[in-house]
Design a protein with these regions (language model features):
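N-terminal Rossmann NAD(P)H-binding glycine-rich loop of SDR-like oxidoreductase domains
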Residues: 7-29
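Rossmann-fold scaffold of SDR-type NAD(P)-dependent oxidoreductases
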Residues: 12, 79-88, 129
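Conserved glycine-rich Rossmann-like NAD(P)H-binding loop of the short-chain dehydrogenase/reductase
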Residues: 30-46
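Conserved residues in the N-terminal Rossmann fold of short-chain dehydrogenase/reductase
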Residues: 38, 65-66, 106, 198, ...
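Conserved Rossmann-fold NAD(P)-dependent oxidoreductase catalytic core, especially the SDR/UDP-sugar
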Residues: 87, 91-151, 155
């Protein structure tokens, strides 16, 4: 973490689960300052009190900026002296974005453009934009706007001066805000049925710590315009629900199938067939370089493009599929789950 020594890091949408994970990982390092940029003063105040209580010796490294990525001036006001940015601000609830698609455009697309414009103007060294598997072959408003966010990042990277811009794309982050596992735990505690959409649906799963690791990998190894992807495992929704039931004493027969929600897919994709043509296998990660050809395609009428796919689409059906015991182990390793199990005496 030597590159963060005495540096200033700005996290947009910083009061969310990702921002909390970064603070837990970074605060006790020699980083200079972490700026939390978000629009909800209540969440900022809650975060301030939380970290003053649990890390009083380093909590003064956190600085809070109220603002909104939808406003370019708001973004500019938080950029002075910033070295690095983790851009996590987003509207990410699939059904909500289906009903309010223009709100998703304003935050996920225009907001990203504002953050990158302000960062380039301020001479920020590196910006990592957080994207999602729903941006690959998108069928819902959330995924479509995140796909455009990725396009905006690549376009901005072509004229970004000294600012390096990369994107990360990852799957479902377990126990992040608005995710399904905390809902299931509450349902079990209250003696209610555990509601799932479709048991055979598959989803990539990763922890918040793995999400932070992916961003750090992009920071260290990404080049301007790159997209970085982690090779995450997956499980079915039915397996995940059964794992949570077994951990918290729920009954398998209490699992209730309610049907697929607005805009959901049966499986998700992290690396598309089209991206495979240029993707570079980096062990536990894929790196997809930006397509920086100009708009002059005349030569391709004569020469063509010799690149051919050497990889195949990486999706939640063809990755490593975890069974119930493996899924239980992964879920049980999470700090949130350990705290919840302690509350119920397990």
């Amino acid at each position: 973490m030597s590159k963060f020594t005495n540096k200033t890091l700005l996290i947009t949408g910083g009061t969310g689960s990702f921002g909390n994970a970064v603070l837990n990982s970074f605060l006790r390092t020699d980083i200079g300052e972490i700026r939390i940029f978000s629009r909800d003063e209540k969440k900022q105040d809650d975060m301030r009190h939380e970290f003053q209580a649990k890390m009083p010796e380093v909590a003064d490294k956190i600085k809070f900026y109220i603002g909104d990525v939808r406003s370019l001036e708001s973004c500019r006001g938080a950029m002075h002296g910033v070295d690095y940015i983790f851009h996590a601000a987003a509207l990410k609830q699939v059904p909500s974005c289906e009903f309010f698609p223009m709100e998703a455009v304003r935050t996920n697309v225009i907001g990203t453009d504002n953050v990158l414009t302000a960062a380039i103007e301020a001479g920020v060294e590196c910006v990592i934009c957080l994207s999602t598997d729903k941006a690959a072959y998108p069928i819902n408003a959330m995924g479509i706007t995140k796909a455009i966010e990725e396009k905006v990042a690549v376009a901005k990277s072509r004229n970004s001066g000294k600012t390096k811009i990369c994107c990360t794309r990852y799957g479902n982050v377990m126990c992040s805000r608005g995710s399904v596992i905390p809902l299931w735990i509450d349902q079990i505690k209250n003696g209610n049925p555990i509601t799932i959409t479709e048991p055979s649906m598959t989803r990539f799963i990763m922890s918040l710590e793995e999400a932070v690791d992916l961003v750090l990998f992009a920071f260290e190894h990404g080049e301007n315009g790159d997209l970085l992807i982690q090779k995450a495992p997956a499980c079915t929704i039915g397996t995940q629900a059964q794992a949570v039931c077994e951990l918290f004493g729920g009954k398998k027969e209490d699992i209730k199938v309610i049907g697929i929600r607005h805009g959901e897919k049966m499986y998700e994709t992290l690396l598309t067939n089209e991206e495979c043509a240029k993707a570079i296998d980096m062990g536990n990660f894929y790196r997809v370089p930006a397509d920086n050809r100009g708009l002059n395609y005349d030569k391709y009428f004569k020469e063509g493009d010799e690149k051919r796919n050497t990889l195949t689409e990486f999706n939640s059906n063809n990755t490593r599929i975890l069974n119930v015991e493996e899924t239980k182990a992964k879920i049980a390793s999470l700090a949130y789950i350990q705290d919840e199990l302690a509350k119920v005496g397990k």
